Amino acid sequence: MRFTLVGNGRMGQQVALVIAQSGCHETAAVLDINTAITPDLFQGSDAIIDFTVREAFFANLPAMLESGVPIVVGTTGWDDLRDEIEVKVSDAGASLLYSANFSLGVNIFLRTVREAARLIAPFGQFDIAFAEQHHTAKADFPSGTALRAADMILSANSRKKSVVRQLSDDKKLAPDELQVASLRLGSVFGKHSAFIDSDADEIVISHTAKSRSGFAAGAVEAAIWLARRHTTAPGFYTMDDFLNETFS
């Protein structure tokens, strides 16, 4: 397969390395911040992989959709406009797969957290919170992965109704609020943890990324899956769609 990469930052470079090391795929083009994105730049590619920033993603999306090439998006920070993006994808008859984190390990972790949140739901003595750590260059917080985890916890545990991203000096956390804490430190690739606490014990479920290679490899695998699916079932997909089919 031939891939066009949009974004030449740390993740874009890691994706290019994974493709080069595969022995069976190739990078058709790498488009960076200085490239004027037009639909013709994607012709001859089987899939687009986008790792940019929110503003660049929105600016480039019309051209990517018009190209008709399946799009895998790892750019985060636009969850508030997801409904709008889904409509654009549908109207264009395009295929787009979005994930805040393409790591297989992270996605196994998220499913474990969701199951733990479900299991403790009937037992009021257990409380749950979530925390994430990333390098100081990461622009958005909480991370997209943390927000995804929060959605999964809320859907699995009816005792938690809303997410609190930052605590204030004059307000206590309500029992039905889920705290999602963020820490920016050094060059941390990414660490996510769910904390479950009672008077008797504490359960901690964590995932720590050792490098960006897992994220990049997952993005490439998702792009291969999306390219195959695009011919018969275009649409808006998530990593869950890919994994549900893979794990079945």
Curated annotation (Swiss-Prot):
Annotated residues that bind NAD(+) are located at D32, G74, T75, T76, S99, A100, N101, F102
Q: Which residues bind (S)-2,3,4,5-tetrahydrodipicolinate?
A: H135, G144, T145
The UniProt keywords, alphabetically, are: Amino-acid biosynthesis, Cytoplasm, Diaminopimelate biosynthesis, Lysine biosynthesis, NAD, NADP, Oxidoreductase
Q: Name one GO biological process term.
A: lysine biosynthetic process via diaminopimelate
What the protein does? Catalyzes the conversion of 4-hydroxy-tetrahydrodipicolinate (HTPA) to tetrahydrodipicolinate.
- Looking at its record, which EC class is this enzyme? oxidoreductase
Instruction: Please give the family membership noted in the entry.
Output: Belongs to the DapB family.
Entry keyword Metal-binding: no
Q: What is this protein called?
A: 4-hydroxy-tetrahydrodipicolinate reductase
UniProt lists the gene as: dapB
